[in-house]
Swiss-Prot record:
UniProt pathway: Metabolic intermediate biosynthesis; chorismate biosynthesis; chorismate from D-erythrose 4-phosphate and phosphoenolpyruvate: step 2/7
Source organism, top-level taxon: Bacteria
Statement: the UniProt record of this protein carries the keyword Zinc: yes
HAMAP family: DHQ_synthase
Reaction(s) the record says it catalyses: 7-phospho-2-dehydro-3-deoxy-D-arabino-heptonate = 3-dehydroquinate + phosphate
Keywords: Amino-acid biosynthesis, Aromatic amino acid biosynthesis, Cobalt, Cytoplasm, Lyase, Metal-binding, NAD, Nucleotide-binding, Zinc
UniProt: Zn(2+) binding residues: E182, H245, H262
One Gene Ontology cellular component annotation held by this UniProt entry: cytoplasm
NCBIfam families, per the entry: aroB (TIGR01357)
Cofactor note: Binds 1 divalent metal cation per subunit. Can use either Co(2+) or Zn(2+).
Name the record gives this protein: 3-dehydroquinate synthase
Function: Catalyzes the conversion of 3-deoxy-D-arabino-heptulosonate 7-phosphate (DAHP) to dehydroquinate (DHQ).
Cofactors required: Co(2+); Zn(2+); NAD(+)
């Protein structure tokens, strides 16, 4: 087992990484506030792992709260089901919520923990690659609104993150690829040598090689922990973690939450960010193409939806958390391994990026 630390003073917490951690009570029990535990999970994950977790926490008063699965259910009505379960089982302020599932479960359980009786403790047990390398670390919680993704939420840190890498054995291939989008992101924004490692090990990662996955998860979590420790509330460098997300959130919102997985939308959005960085003269074609090829090798979509116009993108991007004073800011790349958050770009460069024929571009890159 590896242990990393998110350094936030009195609110610091560990990230445990290893196979079989669902059975390791010592990773969870020290972080429980009291005897009451509510496990928030979904209809897909519950049959796989809920019983094992219940056995690990034997001796505690455990309330399972099983939600419908998917981004389409990341809204107020589903959040209300968590509160219903807590209140019906008479959970008090010394309860601990455990999020057992992917990013949707983690975001909603964390938001419920932030709100319930004005704040109770919670633990993240992420079971998808995307949630293990990204959403479970850093305390971003929330739900979607019909007009924009993750627009309602709170910064609320967990007491621990427990990453059982063995849960990836049950992950569908499409979900694995979606998680790789966020892994690749770390290489693009802050760790260029990691891109080389990913190019070497991509086949092993997609084949669920345990050693390769553990290394990728640890490097990703370490990168995120460093950024969160410096900028918890995204006033500066943390925003670089949103590479591809402004374009990607527009895709998710326009296409209907769940039609594209979050990682798929981030991949297509990252391609657009790479292209815009090239148009601004920061990346050469070879650097842009290197990033795109890696996303392709991960089995990810690299072409935005054909039915989305430039105006569709601009309309959704106006409702983005990085908009300040009415000005759109984007995460772009000065070079591979160095990201910047900027609103200082000519609109023509953005318009040209949105107007690019990405299907033709991919044909050129593949020849």
């Amino acid at each position: 087992m590896q242990t990393l630390q998110v350094d936030l003073g009195e609110r610091s917490y560990p990230i445990y990484i290893g196979a079989g951690l669902l059975d390791r009570a010592e990773c969870m029990v020290p972080h429980l506030a009291g005897r009451q535990v509510a496990v928030v999970t979904n209809e897909t994950v519950a049959p796989l792992y809920l019983e094992r977790l219940s056995q690990t926490l034997a001796g505690h008063e455990l309330t399972p709260i099983v939600l419908p699965d998917g981004e389409a259910f990341k809204h107020w009505e589903t959040l209300q089901k968590i509160f219903d379960g807590l209140l019906e089982a008479r959970h008090d302020r010394r309860t601990t919520l455990i999020a057992l599932g992917g990013g949707v479960v983690g975001d909603m359980a964390g938001f419920a923990a932030a709100c319930y009786q004005r704040g109770v403790d919670f633990i993240q047990i992420p079971t998808t690659l995307l949630s293990q390398v990204d959403s479970s670390v850093g305390g971003k919680t929330g739900i979607n609104h019909p007009l924009g993704k993750n627009m309602i939420g709170a910064f609320y840190q967990p007491k621990a993150v427990v990453i059982d890498t063995a849960t990836l054995a049950t992950l569908p291939e499409r979900e694995l690829s979606a998680g790789l989008a966020e892994v690749i992101k770390y290489g693009l924004i802050c760790d260029e040598p990691f891109l080389g490692w990913l190019e070497t090990h991509m086949a092993a990662l997609r084949a669920l090689d345990a050693a390769a996955l553990t290394e990728a998860i640890a490097r990703s979590c370490a990168a995120k922990a460093r950024v969160v420790g410096v900028d918890e509330r995204e006033s500066g460098v943390r925003a670089t973690l949103n590479l591809g997300h402004t374009f990607g959130h527009a895709i998710e919102t326009h296409m209907g939450y769940g039609a594209w997985l979050h990682g798929e939308a981030v991949a297509a959005g990252s391609v657009m960010a790479l292209e815009m960085s090239r148009r601004l003269g920061w990346l050469g074609e070879a650097e842009r193409d290197r990033g795109i090829r890696l996303l392709q090798r991960a089995g990810l979509p690299v072409v935005p939806p054909a039915q989305m116009s430039a105006d569709d993108f601009l309309g959704h991007m106006a409702v983005d958390k990085k908009v300040l004073g009415g000005r759109l800011r984007l995460v772009l790349l000065r070079r591979l391994g160095e990201a910047v958050v900027t609103g200082d770009f000519p609109h023509e460069a953005l318009q040209a990026t949105l107007d690019t024929d990405y299907r033709t571009l991919m044909e050129q890159i593949s020849h």
